[in-house]
Structure formats: C-alpha cells, structure tokens
Amino acid sequence: MLAVRAWGRTYNTLVQRKLNAACPTGALPAVTLRPLHCSLVARSPEQSLKDSKTFDPTLLQFLVCPLSRKSLRYEESTNELINDELGIAYPIVDGIPNMIPQDARMIHKDRKPESPDTEQTT
C-alpha cells in the first residue's frame, strides 16, 4: 500500500513538472467540456429499445451541414437531415446522422432558370 502511495506522489510530481514546463506562466490551457445530449438518459423505463434507433431532433441545435455550415432540418418521413439551400439530404442510420458529403443524396433536380431572352415566340 505504501508503494502505491509513493508511486502516486511520484507520478503527480512528474505530471506537475511536465505541466510547468509546458506552461511556464502557471496558467493551464482552458478546456471546455460540454455534455452531449444522450437520448438514453431521458428514456423512461417503459420505452422499448426499438425507440433508441430513432433520431433525436434536439441534436439539430448542434449539427450543421459540413459543406455550407448552415443549419439542417429533420425530415421524419424520409429519416434524413435536409439542407434546403444546397438541396442535399444526409441519411440517418440507426439514429446516427451520416454527415459524409459523399453519402448525401441530391433532392433538387438541376433546374435551368429560364430567361426572357431564350423564350420562343409563336
């Protein structure tokens, strides 16, 4: 037991020396810890495990499109996160959004705007 205490003190001393060398002013770098929302914590005991596979819409306040950095909206009927500005939809698999741009699908067809110069008169 004494060996464990001695090792603990030695380890703490080594860590403190390393921190002092890394931050000579004594100020440690600020680290911000933000808890992430976990739907399992908020689940009532009578809910089935099947519900854990659904997307939690409260996560939308933390998620943005990786391409445009704009907010997304959740489309429950298709189980996708939609970026209306770019016209793409990110799939949600087992309650986890797949935010890889290569896996997103286009939801708007390429529309060519009609200008008055190209209209034909009959």
From Swiss-Prot:
<dbReference type="GO" id="GO:0050821">
    <property type="term" value="P:protein stabilization"/>
</dbReference>
<dbReference type="InterPro" id="IPR005651">
    <property type="entry name" value="Trm112-like"/>
</dbReference>
<feature type="transit peptide" description="Mitochondrion">
    <location>
        <begin position="1"/>
        <end position="40"/>
    </location>
</feature>
<comment type="function">
    <text>In mitochondria, S-adenosylmethionine-dependent methyltransferase chaperone that supports both coenzyme Q biosynthesis and NADH:ubiquinone oxidoreductase complex (complex I, MT-ND1) assembly.</text>
</comment>
<comment type="similarity">
    <text>Belongs to the PREY family.</text>
</comment>
<protein>
    <recommendedName>
        <fullName>Protein preY, mitochondrial</fullName>
    </recommendedName>
</protein>
<keyword id="KW-0496">Mitochondrion</keyword>
<keyword id="KW-0809">Transit peptide</keyword>
<feature type="domain" description="TRM112">
    <location>
        <begin position="56"/>
        <end position="102"/>
    </location>
</feature>
<dbReference type="GO" id="GO:0005739">
    <property type="term" value="C:mitochondrion"/>
</dbReference>
<dbReference type="Pfam" id="PF03966">
    <property type="entry name" value="Trm112p"/>
</dbReference>
